[in-house]
């Protein structure tokens, strides 16, 4: 009996964020590919280059001295469970959120820095 695409999708939907990240890295190794999105460069004018960025990624660079406070802040910001938040914090540098607005990214950065973490907004 073969597994359907729907069953695979349901199984992935039930995984934690850390499990999905691990699955992606295993797939990258097995198939020799990268999950990074391919960027096509279009021959556009300078107006396109001047466009302001609207989506930002929040990256935890370093934990700092107060690891417990950082884990609490990550849990609050991401909705992860305690173990997943701890694993994510300990794997720094790690991307916490992707594609968030500038205001949300700056708020998250401020909260995490108050907890003692080093954070970058890209």
Swiss-Prot record:
Pfam families the UniProt entry points to: Ribosomal_L12 (PF00542), Ribosomal_L12_N (PF16320)
SUPFAM superfamilies: ClpS-like (SSF54736), Ribosomal protein L7/12, oligomerisation (N-terminal) domain (SSF48300)
Gene Ontology molecular-function annotations: mRNA binding; structural constituent of ribosome
Keyword Chaperone among UniProt keywords: no
GO BP annotations listed: translation
GO cellular component entries: cytosolic large ribosomal subunit
Keywords, alphabetical: Ribonucleoprotein, Ribosomal protein
Record bears the keyword Nucleotidyltransferase: no
InterPro entries noted in UniProt: Ribosomal_bL12 (IPR000206), Ribosomal_bL12_C (IPR013823), Ribosomal_bL12_C/ClpS-like (IPR014719), Ribosomal_bL12_oligo (IPR008932), Ribosomal_bL12_oligo_N_sf (IPR036235)
Transmembrane segments: none
Family: Belongs to the bacterial ribosomal protein bL12 family.
Described purpose of this protein according to its UniProt entry: Forms part of the ribosomal stalk which helps the ribosome interact with GTP-bound translation factors. Is thus essential for accurate translation.
Quaternary structure and interacting proteins, as annotated: Homodimer. Part of the ribosomal stalk of the 50S ribosomal subunit. Forms a multimeric L10(L12)X complex, where L10 forms an elongated spine to which 2 to 4 L12 dimers bind in a sequential fashion. Binds GTP-bound translation factors.
Annotated protein name in UniProt: Large ribosomal subunit protein bL12
Native source organism of the sequence: Sodalis glossinidius (strain morsitans)
Gene name per UniProt: rplL
